[in-house]
């Protein structure tokens, strides 16, 4: 977890998660094993990030993310 990141209450990070600078996370978020959150991304409350998924920098996540996905944009869409 890098500097200036905000993690809301009741949020869970599994093993091997990476949270870059300036990430903002709402409450009740679940980041599964190996989740990667790029710089300046924003994640809405009650979101689940799948195993080994990548959230691109500057993305705004408003929907759950499947396992092994790459998501980017505002709003975040699955690229792979």
Each model region followed by its residue ranges:
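Structural signal for interior beta-strand "rungs" in well-ordered beta-sheet cores
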Residues: 1-72, 76-79
């Amino acid at each position: 977890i890098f500097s200036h990141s905000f993690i809301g209450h009741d949020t869970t990070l599994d093993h091997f998660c990476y949270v870059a600078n300036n990430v903002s996370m709402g409450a009740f978020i679940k980041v599964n094993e190996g989740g990667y959150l790029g710089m300046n991304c924003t994640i809405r409350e009650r979101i689940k990030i799948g195993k080994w998924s990548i959230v691109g920098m500057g993305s705004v996540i408003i929907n759950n993310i499947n396992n092994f996905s790459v998501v980017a944009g505002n709003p975040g869409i699955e690229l792979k």
